Amino acid sequence: MKVSKVIEIFLDYHRNHSRPNTVRSYEAILKKFGLIFGDKDLEEVSSEDILTFLSKITDGRKQQTRRIRYSHLSAFFNFIINNIDERIQNPCAN
């Protein structure tokens, strides 16, 4: 399954189950993530991809910003594992 498809599923879920600020926060990071990895299959996203992506979008920002964005990506992959495909590995967990 493509990353872009799962991003939409994840965001739709949170639009119905989370607070607006939480949704906006997820949208901000996942839209950027989707621009780079949207056409990739989930299985193709590696830990190295995650670290490179975070370096690009958090360059010059506080460590707390990097942690929050990493946490959002980890939550995204955990959602996939728990709700869509348990065979997927969370690249944030490595």
What are these regions (language model features)?
Residues 3:
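Gly/serine-rich nucleotide phosphate-binding loop at the start of the catalytic core
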